[in-house]
Design a protein with these regions (language model features):
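N-terminal "domain-start" segment that seeds a small globular fold
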Residues: 21-46, 58
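Short active-site neighborhood of thiol/selenol oxidoreductases, capturing the structured segment around
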Residues: 46-67, 172
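Structural microenvironment flanking redox-active thiols in thiol-disulfide oxidoreductases
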Residues: 67-108, 115-125
Length: 197
């Protein structure tokens, strides 16, 4: 009986360890970087040191989902404007240079800095797969505390009139309260594929 109990305990611990490793692999750390945005400003993680958290949105020129999700991202920024959180974007697409990004920002009224991820260093370090995904970063530890969609309004070839789940807001509320986001409750992000080279 004791051997059986030990077996079940060992199995449970092994499963837990695998889950922790998988979660750690999904929630990676933001690397140190020095990159330029579409306005010519240079960004490093030190640029965000006065903030408690920094939220990064994966932008892509011409991506309809990334464009449609923009008002939702803006809504979250405005709602949390007094919470000492920075909101920005980065673009990892090889084909999107700074002039193209600047043109997109002008045409669609994007009022966030859009960092050009030269060499795809952010995308490779974070495991970026699609646009319109957001990453919440602890500016002190550089740990990614959340990654996923803003909400459930957008899907492939579908769009709800209103979102019923605001995953980013829920994550920020949990983090600000000192909790840990349960990534098992977060669906995969919908967006345009980011080709990694």
């Amino acid at each position: 009986m004791k051997l059986l109990s030990k077996f079940f305990i060992s199995s449970a611990l092994a499963i837990f360890a695998i889950a922790v490793v998988a979660n750690d692999d999904w929630l990676r750390s933001m690397p140190e970087f020095e990159l330029t945005d579409h306005l010519g400003e240079i960004h490093t993680m030190e640029s965000y040191s006065d903030y408690d958290l920094a939220v990064f949105y994966v932008q892509g020129v011409g991506c309809p989902i990334a464009r449609i999700a923009l008002p939702n991202y803006r809504e979250v920024r405005d709602e949390y404007s007094g919470k000492n959180i920075a909101f920005t974007m980065f673009n990892s697409n090889i084909q999107d240079n700074l002039p193209r990004i600047a043109k997109e920002a002008d045409e669609f009224g994007i009022d966030f800095p859009i960092i050009k991820d030269e060499g795809q260093q952010l995308a490779k370090a974070l495991g970026v797969e699609r646009t319109a995904e957001v990453f919440v970063v602890d500016t002190e530890t550089l740990d990614v505390l959340y990654r996923g969609p803003i909400n459930d309004q957008l899907g492939y070839e579908t769009q709800r009139n209103n979102a019923s789940e605001w995953y980013l807001k829920d994550a920020l509320n949990t983090i600000l309260a000192g909790g840990i986001v349960n990534m098992d409750d977060v669906p995969d992000s919908k967006g345009c594929l980011v080709a990694i080279f």
